[in-house]
C-alpha cells in the first residue's frame, strides 16, 4: 500500500452508479452526506464529486456535479455483449465507469485538488486509475459491500491505495481474501447513525404491535421472508400488523415477478386477518417517524449484508431487532437482538412470537438495541476517516 499523510479537506468521490440526493440515492449517498456534516463540526468541509441526477442534490457547498453520458448496461442485447467485450480489453467493469473516472480526474485538475486526500467507495478500478493520475496522493478506499473487479485491477488494487478499508470486519476479511491483502491490514470503518434523528418513540404507539421492514423490496433484502413468517405467526395470534417500508428502487417500483410475489403474500396475510401497510418509497427525512410507528424491526436479508444502515437505524429507534445472521449483521447487532439463520422463516417466526408474547421483553430488547446503536455514530466514523487520511 502507498503511504502518505495529509491535513487537507478530503475529496470524497462517489462510486460510478451512485448520486448525491436525499430522494433518489442510496446508502453511500447517505454516508457521504453524514460524513460531510460531521467533518463540518470540526471545521473541515470536504469536497464531493458525484454524478448528477434529475433530483435536487444535497445542499453541500463543495459539491462537483458531473454530467456525463449515462450508458445503460443493456444486458442480453448485441450492444450489451459488445460492452462486455470491452471489459475484457480495458478491464473497466463498464464503459461508463471509465467515462466517469476520466470526468472525475478532469474535475480534480480544474479545481487544483490534485493533492487530495481522496476517499473512494466500492470502486477499485477508480482507485487504480486515481493512483496512476496522482501518484503521491493519499487514497482511502472503503468497501461497503463485496464488489469484484477484473483480474487486471484486482492485481493492482493493493498497491494503489494508502488505506484499504471496509464498513465491517466481515467485508474487510472478504477484501483481504479477494485481493490478496495481508490478513489484518485492512481497516474497519463502521457506518454510523444520526442519534438525534433516529430516537425511540416517547410513548408506545396505539394498536397491535407493528413489525417493520425497511429497505429495497428485492429478493436480496428478503421482505418475502418476513411476510411468510408473519403468515405462520397469524395461525397463533392476530395481535400484530406488518409494515414494509421501501420499494424496489430508491425512487419507486416497477412490476416484476418479485413485486408480484410480495403483492400475493401481502394479500394472503391480510386474508389471514393481519393488516399490511406498504407505503412505497420513504424519503430520508420521513424514515425516523415511520420507524417510531413500530415495536419490532426485522432485517431478513438473504445476501451478506456488510453493515446495513437500516439495521442500526431500527436499533437507534429503540425497536427490538430480529435479523438474519449474514455478513456483518452480527457485528452490528451483537447481543442486543435476535439472530436467525439465512432463509429460516421458522426461526424468524419463533423469535417474533417470543417478542409478541412478552411486552416487557420487547421493551428490554428495544433499550438494548438503542444502547448498542449509540456505539455507532457518524462523528466516530468521521474520526476514523480523518485518522486514516492523516496516517
Map each language-model feature to its residues.
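Carbohydrate-associated surface elements
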Residues: 170, 192
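Nucleotide-activated donor-binding/catalytic signature segment of Leloir-type glycosyltransferases, i.e.
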Residues: 256-285
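Conserved acidic donor-binding segment of nucleotide-sugar-dependent glycosyltransferases
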Residues: 338-345, 354-360
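Short hydrophobic beta-strand element within catalytic cores of glycosyltransferases
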Residues: 320-323
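Short acidic/histidine- and often glycine-rich active-site loop of Leloir-type glycosyltransferases
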Residues: 326-339
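A charged, aromatic-enriched C-terminal amphipathic alpha-helix characteristic of glycosyltransferases
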Residues: 95-99, 360-390
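Short alpha-helical donor nucleotide-sugar binding micro-motif in glycosyltransferases
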Residues: 281, 289-294
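Conserved donor-binding/catalytic core segment of Leloir-type glycosyltransferases
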Residues: 165, 204-221, 226-231, 242-245
Amino acid at each position: 500500500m502507498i503511504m502518505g499523510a495529509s491535513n487537507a479537506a478530503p475529496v470524497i468521490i462517489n462510486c460510478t452508479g451512485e448520486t448525491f440526493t436525499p430522494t433518489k440515492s442510496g446508502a453511500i449517498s447517505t454516508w457521504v452526506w453524514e460524513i460531510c456534516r460531521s467533518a463540518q463540526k470540526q471545521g473541515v468541509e470536504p469536497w464531493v464529486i458525484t454524478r448528477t441526477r434529475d433530483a435536487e442534490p444535497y445542499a453541500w457547498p463543495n459539491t462537483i456535479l458531473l454530467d456525463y453520458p449515462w450508458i445503460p448496461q443493456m444486458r442480453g442485447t448485441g450492444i450489451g455483449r459488445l460492452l462486455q467485450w470491452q471489459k475484457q480489453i480495458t478491464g473497466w467493469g463498464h464503459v461508463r465507469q471509465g467515462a466517469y473516472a476520466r470526468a472525475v480526474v478532469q474535475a480534480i485538475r480544474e479545481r487544483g485538488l490534485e493533492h487530495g486526500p481522496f476517499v473512494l467507495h466500492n470502486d477499485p478500478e477508480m482507485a487504480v486509475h486515481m493512483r496512476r493520475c496522482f501518484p503521491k496522493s493519499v487514497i482511502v478506499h472503503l468497501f461497503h459491500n463485496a464488489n469484484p473487479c477484473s483480474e487486471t485491477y484486482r492485481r493492482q488494487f493493493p498497491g494503489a491505495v494508502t488505506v484499504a478499508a471496509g464498513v465491517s470486519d466481515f467485508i474487510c476479511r472478504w477484501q483481504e481474501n479477494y485481493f490478496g491483502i495481508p490478513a489484518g491490514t485492512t481497516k474497519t470503518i463502521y457506518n454510523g447513525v444520526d442519534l438525534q434523528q433516529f430516537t425511540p418513540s416517547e410513548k408506545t404507539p396505539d394498536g397491535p404491535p407493528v413489525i417493520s421492514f425497511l429497505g429495497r423490496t428485492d429478493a436480496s433484502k428478503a421482505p418475502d421472508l418476513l411476510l411468510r413468517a408473519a403468515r405462520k405467526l397469524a395461525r397463533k395470534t392476530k395481535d400484530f400488523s406488518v409494515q414494509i417500508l421501501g420499494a424496489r428502487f430508491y425512487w419507486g417500483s416497477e412490476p416484476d415477478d418479485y413485486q408480484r410475489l410480495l403483492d400475493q403474500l401481502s394479500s394472503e396475510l391480510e386474508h389471514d386477518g393481519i393488516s399490511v401497510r406498504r407505503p412505497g418509497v420513504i424519503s430520508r427525512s420521513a424514515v425516523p417517524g415511520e420507524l417510531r410507528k413500530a415495536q419490532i424491526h426485522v432485517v431478513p436479508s438473504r445476501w451478506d449484508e456488510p453493515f446495513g444502515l437500516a439495521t442500526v437505524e431500527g436499533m437507534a429507534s429503540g425497536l427490538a431487532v430480529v435479523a438474519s445472521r449474514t455478513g456483518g449483521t452480527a457485528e452490528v447487532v451483537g447481543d442486543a437482538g435476535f439472530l436467525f439463520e439465512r432463509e429460516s422463516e421458522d426461526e424468524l417466526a419463533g423469535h417474533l412470537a417470543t417478542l409478541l408474547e412478552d411486552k416487557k421483553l420487547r421493551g428490554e430488547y428495544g433499550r438494548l438495541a438503542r444502547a448498542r446503536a449509540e456505539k455507532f455514530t457518524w462523528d466516530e466514523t468521521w474520526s476514523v476517516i480523518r485518522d486514516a487520511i492523516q496516517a
